[in-house]
A protein has these predicted regions:
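ATP-binding/catalytic-site motifs of ATP-hydrolyzing domains
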Residues: 68-70, 74
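ABC ATPase NBD coupling module
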Residues: 22-25, 76-92
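The feature captures the beta-strand-to-loop junction immediately N-terminal to the Walker
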Residues: 44-46
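Short beta-strand immediately N-terminal to the Walker A/P-loop
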Residues: 41-42, 94
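Helix-to-loop junction immediately C-terminal to a conserved catalytic motif
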Residues: 59
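Conserved ABC ATPase "signature" region
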Residues: 74-75, 123-138
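Short coil-to-helix segment of the ABC ATPase nucleotide-binding domain corresponding to the Q-loop/switch region
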Residues: 105-114
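A short, flexible loop at the N-terminus of ABC-type nucleotide-binding domains that lies
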Residues: 4-8, 17-30
Length: 138
């Protein structure tokens, strides 16, 4: 068990409800989750079970109906959208289950693209991407 000083991400009581007309659907109910530095976690469930919704809440891409998400001790819902984006870009990354390479880009540019999105200069991103490709033998 890791110490609380290594706590990276913490969620308490996360609940998400969607309202559409007369439909009131609770997708997540009172989810608690702690992720410490070095932890590896998997979120597994059937299609439509709320996995993507949970990840969106944890990353501040959507707001919970109830509950809190702390990233390095900061309540992300209390931050401005710009501050949320900065925190997300610094500490989080998203890989969706239907990811794909962009055929119009080289392998190097496909690897560098997330760094460009995080506003890393093109040359620095390509150097980092080349180093990553070399580490995995590509």
């Amino acid at each position: 068990m890791n110490e609380s000083s290594n706590l990276v991400l913490s969620a308490r009581g996360l609940t998400k409800r969607f309202h559409e007309g007369r439909i009131d659907l609770t997708v997540l109910r009172a989810v608690d989750l702690d992720v410490h530095a070095g932890d590896t976690i998997s979120i597994v469930g059937a299609s439509g079970s709320g996995k993507s919704t949970l990840l969106h809440l944890l990353g501040g891409l959507d707001a919970p109906t109830q509950g809190t998400v702390l990233l390095f001790g900061q309540d992300i819902s209390a931050l401005s959208p710009a501050a949320q984006g900065q925190l997300r870009n610094k500490y989080l990354g998203f890989v969706y289950q239907f990811h794909h390479l962009l055929p119009e880009l080289s392998a190097l540019d496909n690897v560098a693209m997330p760094l460009w999105i995080r506003r890393q200069p093109r040359e620095a991103a390509q150097r980092s991407a080349a180093a990553m490709l070399e580490q995995v033998g590509l």
